[in-house]
Amino acid sequence: MKKIFKIARLELNILFYSPIAWLLVIIFGVQAGLTFTEILYAQETSQQLERPLQVLSKVLFAGDNGLFKAVQDTLYLYIPLLTMGLLSRETSSGSIKLLLSSPVKISEIVFGKFLSIVIYSFLLIVVLTLYVVAAHFSIEALDVQFVIGGLLGLFLLACAYAAIGLFMSSLTSYQVVAAISTLAVLAGLNFIGQIGQDYDLVRDITYWVSISG
């Protein structure tokens, strides 16, 4: 376990030494903030027009235009940029030979690099949690359990994306190729649920294959 944590820490250091990791956190936070404020503004407008209001917790976080749905629809765009160099960088630089010849198991290398992206994914969830805290002080009866379940679901989805990205990174020595191939696979798994909806058999198959639900 110590070797896994050391590899994860080293990978996180490499990740945060580059501007990509910080830039993605900022973009992710701004995107979530814009979605959050737009929903609140729409609800305030509906209240002023005396329109019937729905349960604010679900509208704010889980509606068709909710915060969690917006994050789910765009999360696959972030992960390829994070995972593209996990193993392809080692292969292109030749350091993979040193890793394989060192007293470290291949499974420890894989788990260590995967753990680094899991930790980064948790950081993105922490950013979303800030908006949940803001909603907690703005909404009288926020459905906390419902919101926590949504955060957990997004975290697990990010971990699944990370596993796919790590696998694609192991197939090539070019980071750009790894990023593009990961993006293609994740996009396919996200949009495959829209294929063949007029046919029961195809609809059932694409529903189960679709990673975004």
Residue ranges, per PLM feature:
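Transmembrane helix boundary and interhelical loop/hinge segments in multi-pass membrane proteins
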Residues: L81-L100, F114
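Pore- or pathway-lining transmembrane helices of multi-pass membrane proteins that form conduits
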Residues: I20-F28, Q175-N190
